[in-house]
Design a protein with these regions (language model features):
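Acidic/histidine-enriched, beta-strand-rich ligand/metal-binding domains
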Residues: 1-76
Length: 76
C-alpha cells in the first residue's frame, strides 16, 4: 500500500482510530480518535506510516509501534 496524498485525512475502519493524515516533510502523523481527540506524533518516518496503513489492525499497530515510540502532543 502506498502513502495516501500528503496532508489529506484517511478514514479507517478501526474501533478507536477514526482517521489519520501524514506530513512527509515534517514526519508528522496526526491521529483523530472516535472520541474527537487529535494527537500529532513527531519524527514518524514515511515507511512507518506506510506500514501503519498496510496493517490489518491500525489500532493495534498504533498502540504497539507509534504511541510509545514517537513524541506526541494533543492538538485537539
Amino acid at each position: 500500500m502506498s502513502i495516501a496524498k500528503d496532508n489529506e485525512w484517511n478514514e479507517h475502519d478501526s474501533d478507536h482510530i477514526a482517521r489519520t493524515k501524514y506530513n512527509p516533510m515534517e514526519h508528522a502523523m496526526d491521529v483523530e480518535f472516535h472520541n474527537g481527540s487529535v494527537y500529532r506524533y513527531h519524527g514518524v518516518p514515511p515507511i512507518e506510516y506506510t506500514r501503519f496503513l498496510a496493517s490489518p489492525s491500525q489500532g493495534y499497530y498504533h498502540a504497539d509501534n507509534i504511541k510509545s515510540n514517537y513524541a506526541t502532543k494533543r492538538i485537539k
